[in-house]
């Protein structure tokens, strides 16, 4: 397995090291190449994503990312657009995969729920994040700004197809979340994609939920969801809520996936770089380790992925409230494998 590693900034470096321990234990032929991308690199050289390094990254089987950003040295927005979004578009990471599972011992406002275990499949390369828009008369009382949301049949259909295939392996239930009663043009594409692809999956039950209602149900009745498919903007919102109800984004893993397999997919914890605690050895690497499990599953190593998730669940259940270091968590999980 050839793995491109981007530790990034802050605690990204620390949690990535623990995820690599886990991968090294399970993958004897693991080959890693580290790429120094992020706030430190940009602050020192002005480089965000050099073309030659992106070409090198393309040659790997997958990418493991830590966390990017440090507002103390790089203004917000520069790295998000110039590095993260740029990489997403360049590598056609059209599926953003966000599992949401409430593990034993996780602190959640919904801890009394019998079970929370669903997955959000978010479209990753369209919607209002394509940079299609602009502003005129800036700074005047007549300023006008537009952000155009791009929705294509090609983009929606391939993400919906991925979601149906995933639902087939789980509880065979798929929910489309959108706002079709107001966003009728984009909504029509997504609805037609569900109907068209759904005809190929007759045993997968489908449902529809408006985005505003979905935020209520995710808090009051999360067990109604198994696989959720949605567009880029709604997915951005709903996945953070999913993280909150399952113990916080500190436990949330994610995958940015090119479902065609043409480009390597990237896996990362959802949390940020937290420069205020970097170097203190107190960052929780659980999300990075669960992201490594997603990476293993994506590359066809289902048994290894399931082992990691089971060990993480057992570790969380016995962790308690006392302080525990980043490396200790990584060592315990690695040893238990």
Curated annotation (Swiss-Prot):
Keywords: Amino-acid biosynthesis, Branched-chain amino acid biosynthesis, Cytoplasm, Leucine biosynthesis, Magnesium, Manganese, Metal-binding, NAD, Oxidoreductase. NAD(+) binds at residues 272-284. Its EC number is 1.1.1.85. One of its GO terms (biological process) is L-leucine biosynthetic process. Binds 1 Mg(2+) or Mn(2+) ion per subunit. The record marks 129, 179 as: Important for catalysis. GO terms for cellular component: cytoplasm. Mg(2+) binds at residues 212, 236, 240. Substrate binds at residues 88, 98, 122, 212. Its main location: cytoplasm. It catalyses: (2R,3S)-3-isopropylmalate + NAD(+) = 4-methyl-2-oxopentanoate + CO2 + NADH. It is found in: Cytoplasm. The keyword Repeat does not apply. Pathway: Amino-acid biosynthesis; L-leucine biosynthesis; L-leucine from 3-methyl-2-oxobutanoate: step 3/4. One of its GO terms (molecular function) is NAD binding. It holds the Pfam family Iso_dh. The keyword Nuclease does not apply. Its cofactor is Mg(2+); Mn(2+). Catalyzes the oxidation of 3-carboxy-2-hydroxy-4-methylpentanoate (3-isopropylmalate) to 3-carboxy-4-methyl-2-oxopentanoate. The product decarboxylates to 4-methyl-2 oxopentanoate. Homodimer. Belongs to the isocitrate and isopropylmalate dehydrogenases family. LeuB type 2 subfamily. This is 3-isopropylmalate dehydrogenase.
